[in-house]
């Protein structure tokens, strides 16, 4: 499996999870998961987090997301990391390459409930979301139920590729872990 170990000591490992890799085995994807890698690499030495399918895993990344994932190697580090993620002491920042320039369309969304422009051109979206009742893989904004999602976006660079085609490098800070 194509998983790079970026850092490792006696307490934890930081892994670079590639995009399109499922973290936990599911019915449609039993092999090639991050859990499969962890079981192969560390055998039975990782602490069990919640159940046997989370060996050392204290947070998650979606299948389509590449990035760093922290794996606890001891019960003590697992407890500490889980506490830090729950209390939001860990800052989660992603980079995304987007089609177009989000700043050009802000007038269409600024002022809608939960959408605010903060200083330094930071766009904050703070609203409740829930799973779409028809397509359970999608999330939707809702007003009276769901769970709070807080995300902040900053356009880092806009690449003008000509012929009215632009790409933007956007920094995304996910405060709640829900998007």
Predicted features by range, described:
Residues 1-179:
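RNA pseudouridine synthases
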């Amino acid at each position: 499996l194509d998983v790079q170990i970026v850092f490792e000591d006696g307490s934890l490992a930081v892994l670079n999870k590639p995009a399109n890799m499922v973290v936990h085995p599911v019915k449609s994807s039993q092999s090639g998961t991050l859990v499969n890698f962890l079981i192969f690499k560390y055998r039975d030495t990782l602490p069990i987090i919640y159940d046997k399918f989370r060996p050392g895993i204290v947070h998650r990344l979606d299948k389509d997301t590449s990035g760093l994932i922290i794996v606890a190697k001891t019960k003590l580090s697992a407890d500490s990391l889980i506490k830090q993620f729950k209390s939001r002491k860990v800052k989660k920042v992603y980079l995304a390459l987007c089609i177009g320039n989000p700043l050009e369309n802000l007038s269409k969304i600024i002022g809608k409930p939960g959408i605010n422009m903060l200083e330094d051109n930071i766009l904050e979206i703070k609203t409740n979301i829930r799973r779409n009742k028809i397509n359970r893989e999608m999330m939707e904004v809702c007003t009276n139920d769901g769970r709070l999602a807080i995300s902040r976006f900053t356009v880092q660079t806009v690449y003008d590729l000509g012929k009215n085609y632009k790409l933007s490098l956007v920094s995304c800070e996910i405060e709640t872990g829900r998007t």
